[in-house]
C-alpha cells in the first residue's frame, strides 16, 4: 500500500479484516451483499452480514450441577513423535453436565492427549476411564463402544474420509452394526433414512447424501462430523479445536451443539487455543504447559491474566 499498490485481502477473520483494511466487501453465497468503510462498521455488523441474520450477542449457557465423573485421566505420560516427553503425570476429571476447557499454546501436549483419547497413540503410563471402565489404548473402536464421541482438530485428515459420500461418512462408525447391516447385507433404506434425518437435523448444506464429502465447505464438514459423533448420544465428547478455520456462523452453530450435549448430560473436554471459546463455554478451565497442568480455575471466576500467566509456564496465582 505504501508503494501505491492496491491490496485485496480475503479472510473470514474479522479482527484481521478490521485491523488492516480501508474498505470491506461482504460476500455471501457468491454474491456481494454489502460494502462498508472500515471506520463506519463493526465486527458484529460484519458477522451478521456474513451469515445473513443476527448472531446471538452472548452464549446462553444454563447453570447446571455437575454429575458423576464420566472421564477420568490418571497419571498419564506420553512421548511425542520425536520420543520426547509430551505428557507428564496428567490427571483430569470430567463430569456429567460439564465442559472442562483446556487452554494452552499449541505444541504443549494437546495433540498427543487427543490422539491417545482417540485411540491413535499409546501412552507410556497411565489409566483412562470412561464411566469407570478402563479404556483400551490404541483402539478407536474401544472408545466408540464406551460412548466417547471424538471431534479431532483436523477434520479433513483424521475426522472424515473426503472421497467418500456424505452418507458413507455419516454411518462410518456404525456401518457394521445391526441397525445398518444384516448377514453382511447393508440395509439401504434404513441408511438412506438415517442420513437424510441427520442432514436435516444438523442443517448440512449439500446437494444430497450422495455428494462427495470433499465438495462441502469447512463448516459443513464439521457438521457432518458432529452429526455422526453425536447421533449416538455419547457419554463423553472430546472436542479438539472444534471451530478452527470456521466462519462466525459455523462457530456459533458448533458452540450451540456443544452446549446442547452438556445439557443432555454428556461430559465434554474442550481442547482449544481460542481463549474466547474456552472462556465462553467452559465450566472449569485447566491450562496445559509442556505436558503438565499448570493450574485450574472455575469458568466464572477465571481471569485472562491468570490463564495467560499459566500458559507462559509460570506457576503463580494472581491475587483477585
Predicted features and spans:
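Glycine-rich phosphate-binding loops of nucleotide-dependent enzymes
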Residues: 1-320
Amino acid at each position: 500500500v505504501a508503494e501505491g499498490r492496491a491490496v485485496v485481502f480475503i479472510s473470514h477473520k474479522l479482527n484481521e479484516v478490521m485491523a488492516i483494511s480501508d474498505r470491506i466487501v461482504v460476500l455471501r453465497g457468491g454474491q456481494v451483499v454489502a460494502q462498508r468503510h472500515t471506520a463506519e462498521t463493526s465486527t458484529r455488523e460484519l458477522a451478521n452480514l456474513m451469515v445473513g441474520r443476527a448472531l446471538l450477542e452472548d452464549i446462553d449457557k444454563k447453570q447446571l450441577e455437575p454429575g458423576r465423573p464420566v472421564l477420568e485421566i490418571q497419571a498419564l505420560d506420553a512421548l511425542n513423535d520425536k520420543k520426547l516427553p509430551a505428557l507428564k503425570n496428567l490427571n483430569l476429571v470430567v463430569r456429567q453436565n460439564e465442559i472442562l476447557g483446556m487452554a494452552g499454546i499449541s505444541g504443549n501436549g494437546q495433540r498427543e492427549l487427543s490422539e491417545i483419547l482417540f485411540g491413535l497413540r499409546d501412552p507410556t503410563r497411565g489409566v483412562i476411564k470412561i464411566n469407570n471402565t478402563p479404556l483400551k489404548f490404541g483402539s478407536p473402536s474401544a472408545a466408540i463402544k464406551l460412548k466417547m464421541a471424538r471431534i479431532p482438530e483436523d477434520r479433513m485428515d483424521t475426522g472424515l474420509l473426503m472421497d467418500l459420500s456424505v452418507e458413507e461418512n455419516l454411518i462410518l462408525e456404525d456401518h457394521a452394526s445391526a441397525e445398518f447391516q444384516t448377514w453382511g447385507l447393508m440395509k439401504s433404506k434404513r441408511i438412506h433414512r438415517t442420513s437424510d434425518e441427520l442432514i436435516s437435523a444438523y442443517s448440512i448444506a449439500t446437494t444430497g447424501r450422495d455428494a462427495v464429502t470433499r465438495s462441502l465447505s469447512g463448516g459443513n464438514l464439521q457438521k457432518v462430523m458432529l452429526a455422526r459423533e453425536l447421533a449416538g448420544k455419547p457419554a463423553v465428547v472430546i472436542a479438539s479445536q472444534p471451530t478452527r478455520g470456521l466462519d462466525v456462523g459455523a462457530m456459533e452453530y458448533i458452540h450451540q451443539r456443544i452446549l446442547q450435549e452438556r445439557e443432555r448430560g454428556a461430559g465434554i473436554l474442550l481442547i482449544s487455543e481460542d481463549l474466547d471459546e474456552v472462556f465462553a463455554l467452559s465450566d472449569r478451565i485447566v491450562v496445559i504447559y509442556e505436558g503438565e497442568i499448570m493450574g485450574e480455575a472455575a469458568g466464572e471466576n477465571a481471569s485472562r491474566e491468570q490463564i495467560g500467566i499459566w500458559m507462559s509456564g509460570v506457576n503463580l496465582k494472581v491475587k483477585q
